Amino acid sequence: MKEQGLGIREQGLGLLFCCVFFVALLSLAARAQGIQLGDAPAAAHKEHVELVSDAVQVMAGSPQMVELRFRVDDGFHINSHTPKDELLIPTELRMDAASKVKVLEEQYPKGSVFRLPLDPGNPLDVYQGEFRVSMRLVAPKGASTLVGELRYQACDNASCFPPRTLRVMVAVTGE
């Protein structure tokens, strides 16, 4: 009877060991695929895109074309404004309508063809490195701030990270 009790205890410990091993293995697999678990530091917390433009000067009260420059981190890409697949998240610049600077039109650059090593037959339309969004805007005389957000999803060759929103603030001087 004592032998049976040890057998059950050993079985319980064996089951516990298997569960711990399975959770550890699952955690390693999730990290390898770029999935964020808990508060572990990973590239998913990094923005991977930055605004390079910081100030522009325009003629006050008159429609002007300006370019906002953005830079995507090396080794990453983001979908263009018009991705080839409707399931992909497009890059979109949304400007604050309450701003003194009025945006009349936005023009996004054409994306470049990008092929994932694991799926070369399915080309993507992406931005890499530096890209520029042109805007036709009207600014009042004096100093103003163009305020908005860039919505995008950064990916590397293995996985895509959660969609991000980058705050955009550019000083505009109307002369």
Where are the predicted features?
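Bacterial N-terminal signal peptides
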Residues: G14-R31
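Arg/Gly-rich low-complexity intrinsically disordered repeat tracts
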Residues: K2-G14
